[in-house]
From Swiss-Prot:
GO terms for biological process: trans-translation. It is found in: Cytoplasm. Keywords: Cytoplasm, RNA-binding. The keyword Aminoacyl-tRNA synthetase does not apply. InterPro entries: SmpB (IPR023620), SsrA-bd_prot (IPR000037), SsrA-bd_prot_CS (IPR020081). This is SsrA-binding protein. Belongs to the SmpB family. One of its GO terms (cellular component) is cytosol.
Amino acid sequence: MAKKNAKKSKNSSASIARNKRATFDYKFEEKMEAGLSLMGWEVKSIRMGKVNLSESYVFMREGEAFLFGCTIAPLNTASTHVVCDPMRSRKLLLKRKELDKLQGLVDRKGYSIVPISMYWQKGAWVKIEIGLGKGKKEHDKRDDTKDREWQIEKARTMKKAVQQ
């Protein structure tokens, strides 16, 4: 019998949620990967895709990093003896060196820490990508929009030129 391919291709199903607003509002200078401390009902809800990262952010308290504002909606079939708080703050699992670096940059240079995306790693672990950056000004956002529109227009023009 022939062996089946054991390797799985990395596809988009590993992605759970994206914070599209973060890339529009912030200019990221560094990105990091962090684990999340979750409860059982949260993992089940995440598997069902009931996550919203749009209004969430990371804050530092007593030398630890916490994800605040991330909504994980409980399932209707969740047990009755567990109290499900969809908006609770969740601890980020980072190394001490990374925590100290984040704390220093947030305190001294005024950086913000924002979650960018949530995804599965190796099919079992929920990871979150956080970005360390500064907020964009209104003119920066307009410049980005103009650049994006120019790229689209350029692609259309090239497509028309190739078809003729």
